[in-house]
Regions:
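Primary mode marks residue(s) on the alpha4-beta5-alpha5 output face of response regulator receiver
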Residues: 1-12, 18-128
Length: 128
C-alpha cells in the first residue's frame, strides 16, 4: 500500500524510577515521513501518523522484534485504530516499522526533566 521512510528522533526524558533514582524514559517520537525523497507527513506521540493530504492514523502495538543491533529501536507490528476513508493510507489495517537504525539511548541521567533527542530512521509500511 504505502512504504515510507522516517527520519527523526526518539525523545527521552530524565525521570524518577520506582526506586527513586533517575533514568532515561522514552517520551515520544518526532519524525518526517518521506516518499521518494518528498515529505508526505509526520510521525509523533500516539503513536500517530499525519499526512499532508489531511489523513491521519493512530496505531496500537501488537508485536515487537529486536532491532538489528542493540542501538536500534525494535521492529513493530501495529494495528490501526481507525483507518481513514481517503488519503495516502486509506483502508490501512496495520502498520509495520522495519529497518530501524538508531533511536536507543542509554547514559547518565542527572537532571530530572532534562530531555534527550536520539536520532533514528525507519521504514513504515501501511498494509490493507
Amino acid at each position: 500500500m504505502a512504504k515510507l521512510q522516517a527520519a527523526g528522533a526518539q525523545i527521552y526524558v530524565c525521570a524518577k524510577n520506582a526506586a527513586g533514582g533517575l533514568n532515561w524514559t522514552f517520551r515520544e517520537p518526532v519524525a518526517a515521513l518521506l516518499e521518494e525523497g518528498k515529505t508526505v507527513g509526520r510521525h509523533f506521540v500516539g503513536p500517530t501518523w499525519e499526512f499532508v493530504d489531511g489523513s491521519r492514523v493512530e496505531g496500537e502495538v501488537v508485536t515487537k522484534a529486536p532491532g538489528k543491533t542493540a542501538k536500534d529501536i525494535p521492529w513493530l507490528k501495529l494495528s490501526v485504530k481507525e483507518s481513514p476513508k481517503s488519503g495516502l493510507v486509506a483502508g490501512a489495517t496495520s502498520i509495520l516499522r522495519i529497518d530501524t537504525k538508531g533511536g536507543v539511548f542509554e547514559g547518565a541521567c542527572d537532571n530530572e526533566g532534562e530531555l534527550h533527542s536520539e536520532p533514528y530512521a525507519a521504514t513504515y509500511v501501511f498494509v490493507k
